[in-house]
Amino acid sequence: MDEERLYNDQEDSVEDEEQGMFEHFRLNVDVGQTPMRVDKYMATHLEDTSRHRVQCAIKEGYVRVNDKIAKANLFIRPGDVIRFVMPYRRRGLEILPQDIPLNIVYEDNDFLVVNKPAGMVVHPGHGHFEGTLINALSFHLGISQGPEAADERMGILVHRIDKDTSGLLVVAKNDETQLDLARQFFEHSIERRYVAVVWGNIKEDEGTITGNIGRDPNDRLRFKVYADEDGRGKHAVTHYKVLERFGYVTVVECKLETGRTHQIRVHMSHIGHPLFNDERYGGSEIRKGTIYAKYRQFIQNCFELCPRQALHAKTLGFVHPGTGKWIQFDSQIPEDMTAMIDKWRNYVNFVGTEEDDE
């Protein structure tokens, strides 16, 4: 048996929201292999993967034999090629359950939706082994070793958001739900809307940014936009709509069509409007406005009110894996962002700004 992992994007501390949550596999069936059900064959040849989990993947259409979607009762033959996608499961970390308060927006037997605060790392690793969302979920779900243990009740990440981005995340409670939600993310049918504050006065009331996103070769913790002809990066699309203008900054709603690492941050920076106070992409410096000391102090006060990139995952919608009905969740913009936005609103009302269309 020849097993090949086609890719696994687990580099450094930054992972792709969608692609980093999946592993792609290929199994080449040996010439001497006797006929066997494909689900049994896969469970036998995959480490730490149950037959039940394989059957869930087959049910969701993740498994292909000789490039055709397979059913669980299909018998494989010598020379067959099995290709499949499995939602990624980290291994090798023992999770410490921690009683950390969680803002759970919704919960049932299949999944929960949590409103993550800014500053909380989603998953342990790379210097963050405690105080993460997974540590908190482990305690909440009553699991001794947390979401890395072989426990069917475990919380399973389907996507993630950056440490300093606040907002909604869905966490599956079982394999069937994870695979169903993973498929929806994979097919880009999930509704994800963010609210951001960006530098500059965006010219158009709404627009679409399309550009491949890949790692910056000069900084492994940054990403950049590549032209199609470069053949680098992954296809990414962000739709934006202006919500409020303050001359030197703009409040926008961003809708993700894809979910690449730092996608909104990279795309907005690419068109000359980095997120307010986004240190990694140039938003933690004064990009627009006057040179006067009072203005510089005003900006510093805004940075202190919202000491992170001004980005909140506000809306999350998807088809409920159990009922098949569309379900959507909304969250309030957190206090640090609203305080900063209010300060800008007051500034414009009392001081005004220069016209700064771009």
Residue ranges of predicted features:
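Short Pro/Gly-enriched beta-strand edge/turn motifs at strand-loop
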Residues: 84-87, 220-222, 235, 295-301
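RNA substrate-recognition surfaces in RNA-acting enzymes
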Residues: 275-318
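RNA pseudouridine synthases
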Residues: 1-217, 333-345, 351-352, 356-358
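Short, glycine- and charge-enriched coil/turn segments that flank and shape catalytic ligand pockets
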Residues: 32-33, 148-151, 230-232, 293-302
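Short glycine/serine/threonine-biased micro-segments
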Residues: 59, 117, 123, 129, ...
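The conserved catalytic core of RNA pseudouridine synthases
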Residues: 151-183, 190-191, 214-273, 304-358
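Conserved hydrophobic positions within beta-strands
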Residues: 104, 198, 239-242, 275
